[in-house]
Amino acid sequence: MTIFTTAIEQASDILWNSLLLFLLVGTGVFFTIRLRGVQLRRFGEGVHRVFGNFTLRGKKADDQGMSSFQALATAIAAQVGTGNITGCATALVSGGPGALFWVWVSAFFGMATIYAEAVLAQRYRTTVNGKVTGGPAYYIRAAFKGTFGKVLAGVFSVLIILALGFMGNMVQSNSIGDAFHNAFGMSHLAVGIVVAAIAAFIFLGGVQRIAAVTEKIVPIMAAFYIVGCVVILVMNYKALPNAFTQIFVLAFNPQAMAGGVAGVTVQQAMRFGVARGLFSNEAGMGSTPHAHALAKVNHPREQGAVAILGVFIDTFVVLTLTGLVLITSGLIPEGLTGTALTQAAFSQAFGGFGPVFIAICMFFFAFSTIIGWYFFGQSNFKALFGEKALPVYSVIVVVFILVGSTLKVDLVWAMADFFNGLMAVPNLLALLALSGVVAAIDKE
């Protein structure tokens, strides 16, 4: 298993260092320029559309789609996951505190990318057997005509099923297992069985149950975690100035001051910052367009503005708070990583309740991502094999959730990095090819 893990890590490093680091950020920069800073221009509109008409008793999702808020909640359910707790910790351990700066850079430009994704998902969505559907596979076929477009769309669908439905959900169940083992001493397998059983129940309910669950879980879990982080930062307020100094200085010179991680280079800080940023906010990955395609809006531009808000909440609020808590704790150079590092940081403030707090948050964060990623994979599985084959997909996902809870954390993260990177490539190429369409829609 060690040889296999090493091989996956090396393949992932080649993919990220030689291609994705530049393609992801470059695409975001391109759309920022072409759309004239759309992430700033449309940000206020996104806030208004989500919260201006927000009610706890919104419209129910149906075969014709879901409300704009439900679409955002489903997207954020996928975005706000273990990447905000475990992923942030691994980024800081592998890339040093400066990695958080590169997370911010990729997220800022990623907001322009996700705007393009949501706009195209709305523009090229379709109705199949009376049900609205959409996602990158549809706009990939529009971007590249003929056989090449069909093949590339098929490749994307296979990759997203592997990356999110299977490998990605292994990461989520693995993180829940780690958190509950550290907090309560529960076996990873027992936790995996419980998570798999709850997931199976929700999967059986289809898009209506998915939307109903996510629109209720997401606001509560985010508020719960944010309050916990803010309490710790208030307690550690004297360490905040040094934390921000570390973030900005170590982003360009990882060995320049105390608090850095030995042996880390600028390229590693960038690589892990961008990679973990992608895993967290999913801008450019091609996942969240499946949710945004279903939003009932009057114009594609409206859902694009809403999508921008998802990246902001995920990265600039939730992930940033985690990063600041970890940096101010001073525990990054201590040899801990992943969930254990975050639990140790919270233990400093909350004592024995710290690991329990993170375990509770991890369950809701990771489980909401399982729901969102199942839905994204389901859309592509149905497109490839038909609706009658969906029970097979559901069973396979449940098995991967169960198995993932028992594997070593480095293996599941290595596989997730690799497959997430692969699926982003055809999506980003299609976005660039259809940039003219996005620009035209933005001006309408």
Language-model segment annotations:
Residues Y115-N129, V230-Q246, P254-V261, L294-V297, ...:
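Extracellular/periplasmic helix-exit of transmembrane alpha-helices
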Residues F109-E117, I193-V207, V218-K238, R271, ...:
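Selective recognition of specific alpha-helical transmembrane segments in multi-pass small-molecule
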Residues L56-V93, R123, V128-A137, R141-A143, ...:
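Alpha-helical membrane segments and immediately flanking helix-loop junctions
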Residues F31-T32, S106-G130, R141-N174, D178-F203, ...:
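Helix-loop-helix module between adjacent transmembrane segments
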